[in-house]
Amino acid sequence: MATVLSRALKLPGKKSPDLGEYDPLTQADSDESEDDLVLNLQQKNGGVKNGKSALGDPPEPDSDADVAGASKPHLSEVTPEGFPSEPLGGLEQKATSSLVSYVRTSVFLLTLVISMVLVLLCAFLIPCPPRDLHSTWSRRLGSQGGGDLSPLELADVNRDGLRDVLLTFVTTRNGTEGGGGSQPTADLVCLSGMNGSTLWSSPLPEEAQDVTCLDLIPGSVAKTICLVTGTRKMLSAFNATSGKILWTLNPNYLSNGTLAAPVVVLPDLDEDGVRDLVVLAIGELQPDLCFLLVSGRTGSPVGRPVKYNIVGVGNLIGPQVYITASGAVYILFGFGNIQAVALRDIFVQAQNRDSSPPSLQIEEPEWEKHRSVNLSELIDVYSDGVELLQLVKAPDSNSSSLLITTRQGLVLLRGQDLTPHWKLNLQGLRSQPTPGYFTDDQTLDFLLQTQDGVGMKKMTVVDGSSGSIVWSYRVPCHVKETPTTSAITSDQKSVFLFWAEALTAASLSSDDSSGAEPSGLYHLYLLHPAFPSVLLDLSNTTGIVTAAEVGVNDIWKDAFYVTRTTGMSPEGHTTSLVVSKLSLRWGLMEGQMVQLKETTPKIGRGELRRFLSRIKFVDSPYQM
């Protein structure tokens, strides 16, 4: 039918590209041939079909085609009017294009399926970091039968991303039938930071005065080692993961004295790739101080003991290691004063030779000027009623400053030249200042607690750059000394935590609360520099808080506060020993707001909660 229409439309005369176009030059010929076109269309079954007669005769050739001498068109050229002719190559291109599109779609879907399978495998096979679901926990460790306890130590011993709690304590146990009576025993215990369960426990031959956990191999992923210093002659290294003893210093090397202070970590002296140690022993019958260098790998002495005759009255200071900006290493120590000795001099005497490692040959000219005598090995640093010594980071410097607590107040010495940066006269200061960022100058400030009347103490924040007081408040507290701590936030601010009795409406409105009876209930208060007129009451306890530490969960940007408390019997004896943990972000949301004074505009509870909910804690050591 298409062929009939195609040949019928080839009218005589001038052809037009469109069927309905009017052309007066050819209109007459078109009228004459119109009847023939109608006859051809009516002969559907018996006449012309597909351009051929029923008898098979060839059709009459087109007059125009004969005149033009055109050849018979190919099949591909015979197409309905209005549809372009398409060569066979185009069909092949279409087929190829369809195949490429199919392959691309298949590859995309296959890649998508493989990616989804890998994601699901990672989600199920790779464990997520353990979330600290226990906002608070408390663990009772039994009755306490010893004297002074070592500070708490926080370290991730099981590599789960959460710091665990290590402490030592002495318990009283019934003796054997032959010995009779009660025998005190010392233990080193590691509690899980997740839920307070016991990870491991190890007996100690004597009571411990300090536990320090660190990696003795710098820059390695070696297992953490815990160094335990006893009150007499014990120095042992424990595997922090298992609690097994790695080595113990032979007490015969301390036959003429006892350990006077915790062990101090030094650079690598014997070049075995492990940092070494130094202990300070004091004579039993004379005030001689003896330094003993100890190998960090084996626990064996690195040379013989080195003795110094020290003249001074007061508390034992140090020893502490100080490394200057140029790399010179000094040991700070003293009795009521601060003196320094170059580690090079101790090493040369211990080895009984004139040479020392290149790392110990560096000198600090400004320190060397303070030698008491030209040939003396001792350097006079400070000598005015020293009670405590701290090393704190100095801003814009590779060295540390020396924060000295004296009977008259507080002094900050520059580490470069040992000159005073500022002094603060403050009576009644006996506890160690707590460093933290209170002002906006990125210089460490200090929280102090001083006795201020009967049953009262004053909490004070001192500006680290000038030594001026920027915040203070009197709180009721009948305990001579309670631990203070701080934690740094992501915006380079610090929250300060301290203990006091309840701040009632009467105590807030009155400046003189001396003589009030102790309530026996102590509250943990938090101070944030953004809201100096508000304290947050986070927790409370009826026991005596003997130690506290703050750790940071780096994964969840949270900080946790660990305390050790002891109960008191009516006779004044210590009873139970309790270790507790509190999540600070949880405490910030659940704590009670205590308004110290009215402000304009008034601080609302909703505004405070919105601010506190955005706080994130980071790990940044204050001391060097």
Curated annotation (Swiss-Prot):
InterPro entries, per database record: FAM234, FAM234A_B_beta-prop, Quinoprotein_ADH-like_sf, WD40/YVTN_repeat-like_dom_sf
Bilayer-crossing regions: 107-127
Principal subcellular localization: membrane
Any single GO CC term annotated in Swiss-Prot or TrEMBL for this entry: membrane
Coiled coil segments of this chain: none
Keywords: Cytoplasm, Cytoskeleton, Golgi apparatus, Membrane, Phosphoprotein, Transmembrane, Transmembrane helix
Residue segments, region Disordered: 1-90
Pfam families hit by this protein: Beta-prop_FAM234A_B
Phosphothreonine PTM sites in chain numbering: T26
Modification sites for Phosphoserine: S16, S30, S33, S63
Membrane topology: Single-pass membrane protein
Compartments where found: Membrane; Golgi outpost; Cytoplasm, Cytoskeleton, Microtubule organizing center
Assigned protein family: Belongs to the FAM234 family.
Annotated protein name in UniProt: Protein FAM234B
Organism: Rattus norvegicus (Rat)
